[in-house]
Amino acid sequence: MRSREVDTRAVSRGDYEAFLADLEHTMREYDGTGIAAPQVFTPLRVFLYEVNPETRKRNEKSVPLTALFNATYEPVGPEMEEDSEGCLSVPFLWGGVVPRYQTIRVRALDRAGRSLAFEASGYHARVLQHEIDHLDGLVYLDRMPDMKSLAYTVKFG
């Protein structure tokens, strides 16, 4: 599901706070790192995410729960890394190996409607690319060069 941009004035007024609370509840209920509005059948360019190295076993800086509206990104250099990803939208799959840009520049609005521009690297950049893909109607499977690394959460047969 492709999403449409969110009105900056509506973000500034706090019109989406109840929706963000629902998104957070869903993300936590399913132990997600992030969740985008299209994943709950709402075609808006908004997502929540957090990077918690303690639970994700990554050598990364923490990023507190963050809401981004109308987010876009561009790569900072051609360097890419491959790593495993999974997704709440594809619950029957454990995940697969996905190449992502190592460093990206993000432009978005925060939950107060202020413009943001920042760089992210490593796992933080991977999470952002994954969530922004949802806003563009993509899932991680669309980014996989081959499906050989896919792992299922249940056995069939």
Identify the residue ranges that each predicted region occupies.
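Positively charged
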Residues: 1-157
